[in-house]
């Protein structure tokens, strides 16, 4: 759509101006400023079709990685995610060298990207533990950033018609949906005060619907249901009264949108099953250390058999599943570390007595990994680490 191409180019510039004004007016310190810039970059630059914007995002990640190294060196106390990322990096390097990754441009690029994201994830997680008002500033920034952007997403959807999935500043609708879903929960980690504060999350939910990402809606809808049922019963009743006639009125159109999406995804579903078969074949061939981090996209074709049909006609494909990716590329060693970190953070949910927002952030990260690849996203690691981060904040009364 030409309209979205226009927005992909102009919106990052407009949002940059708003971000600079926000940082200047709040007089934020360097740590919080970096976090705000990271979220700006993720929303506006990371998956934009423009290579200039993507390179700019990589520069932001690189700059923050250097700053994070300073935080890691100066910080005497070692946190859980420091140990995890170190051992996970060991598993990545082992698979890289065992499989001669230096001969693969894909493996080299993936290794560099992972190291930068690993350092960035340690840095942002450390800031979330150390900075008392980080959640307040981030929540406020996301509300201001996404209030008008959500309206634009909805308008693009209405203009384009049912069945159209909005990408906005991203190159993939699911990436946009993941950011919107995470933002909904981050915003609710701070009490909402005025009417606009309460309207923004509703706009975010509507904007998520416009992406057509059911995996995010399956988490977002229960989140709002339990949130307003617990904290604001009157608003829950009002929203229910409004929603019922809307759902009845648009049932036919919503069904049409779903059917269009299902037809488009039929081949994708079959491909995902065949990807599972490929991962199974890889695991049987290289169970301990896998085929090497970042190698699936180019190595999968060597593990096709007679039961696999669709993938024979494809030159490059990813696993669309973090668990498949870790098992195929890093083997049992990497898979053990990955699952350990997830289960360890699930344990910390018990320690913080199931904090509502943290619980849904964690569920969103873990469930999203079943359908997408997120290992090179600082947002995924931040969300997966939130139970531990929140436990540390409570422990030190931050």
State what each model feature region is.
Residues 30-35, 77-91, 112-115, 123-154:
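Interfacial loop-to-transmembrane-helix boundary motif in multi-pass membrane proteins
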Residues 54-65, 80-97, 102-127:
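Aromatic-anchored transmembrane helix interface
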Residues 119-127, 134-162, 169-230:
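Alpha-helical transmembrane segments of multi-pass inner-membrane proteins
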Residues 185, 359-398:
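Transmembrane alpha-helices of multi-pass inner-membrane enzymes
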Residues 194-195, 233-235, 329-365, 390-397:
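Hydrophobic transmembrane alpha-helices and their immediate junctions
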Residues 206, 210-211, 227-264, 280-281, ...:
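A membrane-periplasm/extracellular boundary helix in multi-pass inner-membrane enzymes
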Residues 261-285, 289-330:
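Long extracytoplasmic/lumenal interhelical loops at the membrane interface
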